[in-house]
Amino acid sequence: MGDMKTPDFDDLLAAFDIPDIDAKEAIQSDTHGNHNEHSSVVGKERSGSPSLRPSGSPDPPHNDPSVVSVIVKNSVHSDDKAEGNETGEFSSADESQKSPQKGPSKDSSVPTDPFIYNGLKSVSDGSTESPPSLDLAPGQHNGPLWSLSASKATGDDDKHNDAFTNHPASTFQSLPLSNHPSVSSHLISPNFSSKVDSEEAQAINGTLRAGVRRHQSEDEESEPDLGSPALVIQESPISQLCPAPKVPRMQRSPSSVFQPPSPSSPSLPVSNTQMEEPSVQHPKLHSSTNPTSLTSTNNLPVEEKDLEHIIEERDSPESPEPEISQSRTSLPSNSQGAIESKQRITREEAPQDEVMDVSMQEKVDYGAEATEGKSTEPTLVESASDAISNSASSKPLKMRIKTVKKPVVSITRTVSKAATKGGASKGSGASKVQAVARKSLQKIPRSVASPQLLSQSTKVAMLPVSTLQDASTAMLFAASRAQNQMPTALSATAVNITRTSNLPSISSSSIPGVNVRAASGQKTNTGTAKPASIVNSPGAVISRSQSSLVEAFNKILNSKNPLPSYQPDLTSLPPPEWGLRLPSTGYRCLECGDAFALERSLARHYDRRSMRIEVTCNHCSKRLAFFNKCSLLLHAREHKEKGLVMQCSHLVMSPVSVEQMIGQQDTVPIGVLSPAVSALSAIKESGVNLSQSSDHSCPECWSTFKGKQELVAHFQEVEPGGTDTCCLQCSPPMPLWNSCCAAAHRRMHQQLPPLVCPECGLICQTHELNTHLKQTCLHYSRRLGYKCACCHLVFGGVNSQNAVKTHMQTAHCEIFHKCPSCPMAFKSSSGAESHCASQHPELSESARQSKEIYKCVMCRTVFTQKSLLSVHIDTHLTKQKMHVFKCPDCNKLFTQRTSLLEHVKDTHRETSNHDGTSTQNSLVKMESSDGEEWGRDEEEDKGKVSDANSAVPRSQSWSCSQCQTHYTDKENYISHMTEQHGKELKKFPCTLCEGSFSSSSSLRRHIRVKHKGIKRVFYCQLCTGEKRSFSSKLILEKHIQAQHAGERGTATQSQAVPQFTDGADSSSEHDAGVLGGSSVEPESRLAESTLTRRIKGAPVGEQEAKGLRCMPCGFTTEDREEFLQHIVCHRDGGSGAQCQQCGACFASSSSLSRHLFISHRVRDSPSDHAEAALHTCATSVASDSAAAGGSPGSPLSVVGGLLEDGEGKHICKVCGRYFSKPADLNTHFRTHGMAFITAYKTDKPA
């Protein structure tokens, strides 16, 4: 079906509920202990050309990627009475052709009796002796199979043993030698033994033994079969080029079940003329000189073996089909084709022979056991289920039919039966088997061992071979014929199989060159399938013809495409204006190998209607309908991608009318959707589930939903442990929160259709998916974060785990000082020392040293080392994982995806002329790994401040100068530079150059100084001579301490920023703590100075650094009284918090005290300054309040926070921000904390 590779089948087999037979019990059931020899011989006999398969090596097609398994589970009613061992019973004419020297087997009726292989009788010393005749029944063989001594001593017999094939499921009589003298004489010729070397036999035996070991290991992996033998049904057209060892297993239960005959068909079809005259080919047989062909010629006399071992056979999935028919392998290609054609046509006609000759059963009595000593060859068991269904009591029989698609292997189907523990007598069971076998042998000879038997037993008309070349055509033809013969109670929309449903009986015709292997690991015989009763549920028994339906189902799934795979001609590309993007190999169907130039054609391919297959998928828990095998296998492949093998039941197949085949509606292909199409229509139109009735379904698990919102919620649902799985291909690793999202995300990396958005379930094309993920759903913004269990602080980013650990250890974990002599612990070392001095005075000073212990805040566990606590906290962090969402534009983190979408919509997707900025209500308090609080970044005024002036550019883009690539995601850029160019970048890379920094403040300072040319300058106000400037506040402080120590109390410091813009000023608030070693409040003098410069327009260069300088307006004087009278004009709103050193106003006395200590190093109480200020400005409060222009009830009017410039814009008095509306200014003013609280208290009515 394709050339894709899949995981090893053994790995898949271990994950499924496949009954098996315990190999140990099967070995114990052999009373003679000939398991190894038996397995090797049978494996070798089934190997037409063992040299084609190296010893111990797995089958090359074993890892074929296109292998998609489908398991059909049903149950069957079986007898309470255990069926006896099947033994062959020959007619008198056939027995007359047997050699009189055939060694009898006394225990041939016992199920555990080993075989006598190819007439080689075992002796005590381990060697073999050969009877005179070659046409012998199977016998025992206890010695080494292929020893040099045995091969030299026995000559021809070893060669015959190498050539013979005791077919496990062959139930026909051996080909009479008397009817073909030329063949007989050739077989008996002593010169034949010289054609095969004994060393070659030993090499082949080694290969077989390796296959035995491989096979036993696979059986041990399977699930026990509850003490029941395996009912094996197989159908396998085997190519003569790839046979391999087949390992049988001994029966472990006294009860046995039946095995249908299945001599395989050759790979070459022949005409009807060859079928009618097969004897013409015998001279060609005699003239053949190929040693392999000569060796296989000996297969003619021995056609069958004891059926008990057929029942227990289980093969490795990598082994080819064991059913290499003796007739087929012994005859040349023409004769083989004749037999194959006749077998196939006979089996095609078999469904017409529904009426069995019941009278034949009465002719068989229990005396048939007398013939078992002469031959253990079982007869055809076509109606073996009669022995089951006619029993007095019945118990459920569990059927598992597992079909595996493989390009060039054999088709097998394995049915395992859970039989009852108690068994009836072996003799009665064997007689019953013989009776049923006789009846089916005469009435339904679907597969024969020779053309002569075919001509004697076949009584039905032959169908043309050309009408049954395709499996689907065969199914439709036989189904229509079955419908004409019997009424069917099947509805087109059947959800369950009813009791009276008569499903079409389809025989599986052999198609030359088609090889399929059994996914269940069991190789079984084919040819004619035993019509076992398939039970839907206990009590609902379906007719025996259902087995033919199962055969047809397997034939359809595993049939070879009658036409070669279609490959479009993509050498000439379509015109660019068409907008078609064609892959190099086209859009390929992974199930059948066909490729198409257009994706719509692939969708039509999946939607074609050739039949109707209804199954109940056990994984999806729903009834599904498929109209072609590709759609069914596509559904099975999707389960396979999740590590599951599709298991289904309630199989119903029905043909479709010609009108439905050619008159179907056009479908929307998978993925052919434009971005404008909503997720609702996308999911509605592009569902691959052909039987789905709902418009909203998950493309991954096929769950149906009522609407789009439920589908989105389904993809957003976080499963338990969803934070434990991450995609390692993404950088940083992307958390996969549920199975559907994980499957869709992994398929994006593989670029396999359908491409589904992991966030909302929308199906998109390749070129549309990236745009949808980055702009609509923001899939790549999802990050793995950690939440502190104590304060619910959320940490996100690259080092979020280390950050939350550090936070928990420093903020919440307690440190105690433990007494070295007793269990007492104290929170301080002084307390521990006092305790030791008072309670343990005998301890020396060095022994009194307390020891620090660390207590986990979450589980109260105490550790003696801090490193142990850190390791312990990791165990708690596994439960504290959560998903956070990082804004791709400003790096803010959000705990909810909806909050991120609202933030992006309101902040980054609106026009630059937006009047205001909405409040981020959903933003929670979050910290980056370096301790910054992301939620405390103040909003920027978009109408006034450009993106280039913001701390982090709005539209971030990093470019690699070496390979000229651009990245919008910072992590991807860092990973690219590390992996491709070996450059280790820090957490905050610059967007304008290749520099990187460890903190955002350092990055802002770098952008401001290096790229904008804006330098922050600090002037010394105490230097009366030449103007002294300093690059940092710390250097200025050192200068003042060294040069102006005595003048520090009356000095003020100022900073001059000649080229500062509004954005630089606003960002400098955050940098003040880094540059000056202190944390400046938003009500700082810098903001006041900026506001004054905006209003007054006083240039900074004109302000002289001498005497007392007014910070708001830049007024400078040496007279303090004059200075105090001047600064009163800046006190608006009656506030009494004004700095007497620089004139800056504050909303509260605590802010003023902090300002005095930080800026002026003054610890005096601000009450004196407040009283002086109130005394000097009593007359100006009313006028200043009126000039403020605020409403009487507005807090801004109280503190003078609302100012209006010449352009009619409103300015915040605290920080100097511009706003176009009073409402926006009022909202912004709340961010100033204490200033807003003070204004609110002042404005509150008494």
From Swiss-Prot:
Widely expressed with highest levels in kidney, spleen and ovary. Signal peptide: none annotated. It is found in: Nucleus. Gene3D superfamilies: Classic Zinc Finger. GO terms for cellular component: nucleus. Residues 929-940 have a biased composition (Acidic residues). May be involved in transcriptional regulation. Pfam families: zf-C2H2, zf-C2H2_11, zf-C2H2_ZNF592. Residues 24-47, 302-317, 341-350, 360-375 have a biased composition (Basic and acidic residues). A zinc finger (C2H2-type) spans 587-619, 696-719, 817-840, 854-876, 885-908, 958-981, 988-1011, 1018-1044, 1137-1160, 1210-1232. The gene is znf687a. Belongs to the krueppel C2H2-type zinc-finger protein family. One of its GO terms (molecular function) is zinc ion binding. SUPFAM superfamilies: beta-beta-alpha zinc fingers. Residues 24-387, 907-953, 1045-1093 are annotated as: Disordered. InterPro entries: Zn532-like, Znf-C2H2_11, Znf_C2H2_sf, Znf_C2H2_type. Residues 287-301 have a biased composition (Low complexity). Keywords: DNA-binding, Metal-binding, Nucleus, Repeat, Transcription, Transcription regulation, Zinc, Zinc-finger. Residues 88-111, 163-195, 326-338, 914-923 have a biased composition (Polar residues). This is Zinc finger protein 687a.
